[in-house]
Amino acid sequence: MLHYFGYFAAIFIGLSLGIMGGGGSILTVPVLVYLMGVSPVLSTAYSLFVVGSTSVVGASGYFRKGLVSLRTAVVFLMPSLLAVFAVRKVLMPAIPHVLFTAGRIVFTKDLLVLVAFAVLMVAAATSMIRSKQAEEVLDEELHFPHAFNYPLILTIGLVVGTLTGFVGAGGGFLIIPALVLGARLPMKLAVGTSLAIIALNSLIGFSGDLSAGTPIAWTFLLGFLAFALGGIVLGTYLARFIPGAKLKPAFGWFTLAMGSFILAKELLFHHG
């Protein structure tokens, strides 16, 4: 029965991506774990495929409008792609299933992934809730002339690649400010470039799983993706009538509640 809710949630993920242009994919791992019964570590691999594929759709629209900075994307992706591939190919398989035990509590690899993901959800939610104020601050920064900040872009690229590889999320809330502050990109150009970065990061990370021999249930994964893509098509149409920017704070509060719930559930009620 929960599987039906899971496929409905996949449509909702796509719908939110279509309307808001990003953010919805942060729900992919929780949906796969709690509604579809996929293990947390495998869910991060599946999430990379779903996030990567949906971001390709989003980025292609921006690319056609000339809203992707290829130079910035290349600089950002140099450390990012290496990091995400190394994490999926080498680090994730090397982490032991049981990290440590404390009384009845068994801290496992799955628990580590879920806790890290929940913390990321809370951070991303805070960014969405404050999106309007943050955009105004970033737009103000563009009035001050600065050179292209290679160290900042390369450093954030490395951080995002590692983060994406570990939890299977895109990290757009980190990428966009870095592109505005470090590459001096206007907001629309930063959003389009961010989607291109997320698409490549996620799909290269997923290829790391494939090369590591991670078993993939392709029929299930492609079916889940199909529902998400259907949601994107519907969301893109509805975006003509619904202001996505106004929905983002509400979606942020929902994501904050979900992240807090996962933290409470896994840390307070988890016993291995």
Model-predicted segments: where are they?
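Juxtamembrane transmembrane-helix boundary motif
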Residues: 1-13, 34, 61-160, 211-272
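Transmembrane alpha-helix interface/packing and boundary motifs in multi-pass membrane proteins
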Residues: 11-21, 158-167
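Juxtamembrane transmembrane-helix termini in multi-pass membrane transport proteins
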Residues: 20-73
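Interfacial segments of multi-pass membrane proteins
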Residues: 28-42, 174-189, 208
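Generic transmembrane alpha-helix signature in multi-pass membrane proteins
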Residues: 29, 58-65, 163-165, 175-180, ...
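Membrane-embedded alpha-helical segments of transport systems
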Residues: 49-57, 78-90, 197-204
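Transmembrane alpha-helical segments that form core, pore/gating elements
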Residues: 146-183, 187
